[in-house]
Structures are given as structure tokens and as C-alpha cells.
Amino acid sequence: MLDVKLLRNNFEEVKQKLQNRGEDLGEFEKFGELDKRRRTLIVETEALKSQRNEVSQEIAKLKREKQDADAKIEEMRVVGDRIKTLDIELREIDEKLDTILMSIPNIPHESTPVGESEDDNVEIRKWGEVREFDFEPKAHWDLGTDLDILDFENAAKVTGSRFVFYKKLGARLERALINFMMDLHSNEHGYEEMLPPYMVNRASMTGTGQLPKFEEDAFLIEAEDYFLIPTAEVPVTNYHREDILKAEDLPRKYTAFSACFRSEAGSAGRDTRGLIRQHQFNKVELVQFVKPEDSYAALEKLTGCAEEVLRRLELPYRVLSMCTADLGFTAAKKYDLEVWIPSYDSYREISSCSNFESFQARRANIRFRREPGSKPEYVHTLNGSGLALGRTVAAILENYQEADGSVLIPKVLQGYMGGIEKIELPK
């Protein structure tokens, strides 16, 4: 949520920045009109209250002097009724303004590239060499089926499309990746480990920005009004909802493994095969709470933590700075990490690392005090995938495949796999 004072004092500047996002400005313009009416009502109400006070004093004086006060009493009744009417309208406008405010996205940071589509995202750097195969490489869904480590068919029978059973060494590979990522982030990168709830309430989804605008993308348990989490970002960020933190306790850095649940409502027909776009998938998340002046340096470090996972797995990747049109609702600046997937002959997103500035903190009321007794300020929140597990498995299977259909295990994972160096075809 944006600072309402910023909207009121810099309306045209904010409007231009939202235009750079490609936003429909209808609601934003409505905010300006309603806010103008609100200011008019406040001025009128204050004038009427002042008039009421004056009339009240006049009535008291008339009564002390034993004079007829009926006309003044009637005047005060009319003024009072008008104040009540204006107060009702003011409350209704405030409710409408709050609703609109929750639907306005974050303002892009000045360093975010201005663009109209994903084609305008800017490549920052690349790492690793894309492998040249001397045989026809298979897609990960075929490799997983042939190796008997991924079963999409029975998952479709048990649940439906966009689900998978990990089996045998496939399940062990996923578990190895989880342990490797969590160990790296907690032992070397200084993150505190968490295992969060997989269901959250409506206030939590609102706090991180999924609600109210993107409710159709979420899985709702209607009987309880709980949501299955789309990412561990939601419970971990809301861990500090309504908290006032101490300055000396910042930054707070958390890493959390969780299952993630997404309806993929807007993705019909896209990535229908394999692990790239599932309704349920595992992910390791990185979340930070920092002082405002530290958030952009923190974003660079957080992105580096996600990159380190790919480097140790020796998977080729690139980093993109996302343009204003591809920024997402909550971020002021976002980097995407894309890993090379041979079956797509392209890089595919495996992590997003974002600085939300105070956008989420305002929605969730997460603040800190610089000194005891000082006025609380909003923290800046950041998060990043460190990494998405299904896409990491897909990248490993495709990039580490051999001509005989087997798949090598990345060296950094072999200790987590009990020394297994290769997944071979069943005999």
C-alpha cells in the first residue's frame, strides 16, 4: 500500500509512474476525485462544528439571561443534522478510498527500466556456459518418466492436471535440494530457518498484496476462510504483522521451505507438460526486514544468495532487471533469475528477488523504532526464491543428462544423496 500523503501531495508524479507500469488509471483518477471531495467535506464539517460551538455558547448566554433561545436551538439542530449527513458521506468516501488504495500497485524505483512488455526487461549478467549436446537431448518430463522418478500420469489420476508424484531417486533428489538450499542459506548466508504454516488467513494474504486483487489465483478453503499459501513469503512476512521491531534487531533474515499452491488461473495452455508450472510445488524462500536506507543494498545481497545456489549446482543462468510493465503488483524493483532449460532452448524463470520498500509493511503494519520512545517507521521488506524446487529439478535433469538416458547428480548434491553420482535407467 502506498503512503496516502504521497498520493495527495504528488498526485501527478505518482500518476506518471503508474502510467509507466501500463496501469489502467481509472481507479487512480477516481481516488483523486474522491479525495478532492473528502477535503471539501472536511472543510465544510469543521466550519459547521465551529458554528455549532458558537451557537451553543449563544444559547447558554440567552438562557442565563432568561431570554428566548428557541430560534438558536433550531439553528443548532439543523447544523447538527447537516454535520451527521456530512460525517456519513465522509465515512463512505474513506471506505472507498481505502478500497482503491489497496488496489493501486507499488511505484517503480527510479532504477527500474521503463518498458511496455517482458521484451523490455534488461539483462544484467550471465553465468555459466550453455551445454552443447552431441546427441538429441530429452525434455525433463520424458527423462523423469523413463527413469521412473517422475509420474505425471498417476498424479493426474489421483488429483488432476499440473500435479506430479516424485518417486525413488526423484523424491530423494528433491529432498537433497531442499536440504542443500536450507543449509546454504542458514549456515553461510545468515538466514534464520523457519517452517511456516501452509494455510493463512485473509489478513495475511492482504498484508503481502495477494488480496484483494488476485484472489482468483489463490486456493481458498471456504469453510474456514483460509488460503493455501502461494509462497512462504506470505506467512513469513506476516510473522511480524502489527509488530514494532527494534532498530538493533534489523535486518531480520528468514529462510523457509514450504509447499506452494497456485491456481494458475491466467496460464491456461501454457507449460502444460512437466514441472515448470504446477498447482503444487516446493520452494525455498528468502525474506528480509530492513531499515529503509539499507533495502537496495540488501536486494543485491539477497539476489546474490539465490545466484549462489545456481552457481554451486553449476547451472547456467542469467539475471534480468524487470521493466515497469513486468514488475508485479507489489515490487518497486525486481530481479528475475532465469536458468537454461534445453527443451525450451531458452532461459526460464527460477527465482524472483524483489524490494517492496514499505508497500507490504504499510499493509501489514510492520514498523521499527530507531530509538526507544521514537516515532515508529515502516520497515522495508524484501523476498526472493532461493530456489523453486520443481524448476531446479527440471534444470538438473535436462542439463545433466547423458546420451544413454541417465542423469548425473551435481557434485554439491552427492553428499546429500548418500554418495549417489548418477540416476540410471531401470533395468
Curated annotation (Swiss-Prot):
Subcellular location: Cytoplasm
UniProt keyword annotation of ATP-binding present: yes
Pfam families: Seryl_tRNA_N (PF02403), tRNA-synt_2b (PF00587)
Protein name: Serine--tRNA ligase
Protein function: Catalyzes the attachment of serine to tRNA(Ser). Is also able to aminoacylate tRNA(Sec) with serine, to form the misacylated tRNA L-seryl-tRNA(Sec), which will be further converted into selenocysteinyl-tRNA(Sec).
GO biological process: selenocysteine biosynthetic process; seryl-tRNA aminoacylation
Domain notes: Consists of two distinct domains, a catalytic core and a N-terminal extension that is involved in tRNA binding.
Oligomeric form and interacting partners: Homodimer. The tRNA molecule binds across the dimer.
Record EC number: 6.1.1.11
Binding sites annotated in the UniProt record for L-serine: 231-233, 285, 385
Recorded GO MF terms: ATP binding; catalytic activity, acting on a protein; serine-tRNA ligase activity; transferase activity
Main location class: cytoplasm
